[in-house]
Amino acid sequence: MQSVDVAIVGGGMVGLAVACGLQGSGLRVAVLEQRVPEPLAANAPPQLRVSAINAASEKLLTRLGVWQDILSRRASCYHGMEVWDKDSFGHISFDDQSMGYSHLGHIVENSVIHYALWNKAQQSSDITLLAPAELQQVAWGENETFLTLKDGSMLTARLVIGADGANSWLRNKADIPLTFWDYQHHALVATISTEEPHDA
């Protein structure tokens, strides 16, 4: 049975960012992820799942040592933002020039962020990546948690972090309540190519 200080259930962007942030802390960290990410092909078409990374997130990703890797792949900076709600009069807009910045942030494919964090975690001697790995059972002891994987292997951890998404298996097993509501909204996501520059 393997013992670690911190077990992170979910090796997506959030789980991997936590793991990379714990690097060098002296804690033994294990990340449990259902799938190993596929390598990113340089000529692959852009993916539709993206995140707007603001300046604070850029600083975090820089501190984690992955921002330059992300920029070297695919990232597009944005200079303005406008947010509104069709059901109210709420509206806000701002731009980089009025705030004295060169840009507000970057739009980055989630897979690019994920792959950069995965590579960083792989390089760390403090982090063990367990993938593919899927939880089957969890039991909370007085000073540690016992995790049983579907392949029958076991792991103990002093701290368990649930980063396994909106429909978290771990959160459900821990009986942590969740408040949510359906907005009755739908979204259309697309990649658009323009003949003329759009001055993002």
Regions found by a protein language model. Name each.
Residues 2-4, 150-159:
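Core beta-strand elements of the Rossmann-like FAD/NAD(P) dinucleotide-binding domain
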Residues 14, 37, 167:
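Conserved Rossmann-like nucleotide-cofactor binding loop
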Residues 23-48:
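Glycine-rich FAD pyrophosphate-binding loop
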Residues 25, 124-125:
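Conserved dinucleotide-binding and phosphotransfer motif residues
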Residues 54-116:
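Active-site-adjacent segment of FAD-dependent monooxygenases/related oxidoreductases
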